[in-house]
Amino acid sequence: MGLAFPPSHQNDAVQNLRRWLKESRVHAWIGVLIACFALQTILEVLGWLGHVNLEGALLSYVALPAWANWQIGQIWTLLTYGFLHYGFMHLLLNCVMLYFAGHMLKTFWTDLQVVRLFLVGIITGGIAFVLISLWSPGWNPLMGASAGVLALLLAATRMSPRMPVYLLGIFKVPLWVVSAILLFISVAGLSGENGGGQVAHLGGALAGWVLGRSPEYLTGFSWRTSRFGSRAPLRVVREKTLELDAILEKISKVG
């Protein structure tokens, strides 16, 4: 016996989802991560049915390998690895952490600054992974948005270390305790099987801590604005100066 939902309920669900995704860039990026994981899953299933490793082909192009297998020409993998995940629980944990860390930081920053730090954290974590893998060439390819999530968490911690957080919805602790626990786990896991992932976590955390007091560096400006934008204010000042000179000249003539 199947269940069928009225079309009106289906439309409401779709509209609510669209509204939620548009409410915040953080929500939108959660949607991106879920969509990418859905693509991974579809390719895995299709590959299994056709006896072709389609997901492996995707990962070879998008995941971030260790230095020994990484080519500088694939520079985009320093970012794109953050859109992929090893499994559903990996995705779920990062999405939940992104939601809460992102909204905590939005207390102090703009929506755009939060998302840009998330992406910077992913890139910084990727760079740390590639560099340290010089001494650990056997690391598995890196995937996951954890470095970006930790960047947000550390930035929020630097802005407000005593912000109350409820662990498991019960235990009230300051935010710095949560960050300290996660950093300890990453440091303790450096020599473990996921040492490369822990290095990326610490790289993202470092980016969040450094930029935590300098969100202005995450404020957008285009190359066009940075190169030519200063001319407009000068022109306005010059025009106002000429107008003022003309007025003063008229006043002097009148007496």
Cite the ranges covered by each PLM segment.
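A detector for small-residue-rich transmembrane helices and their helix-helix packing motifs
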Residues: 2-251
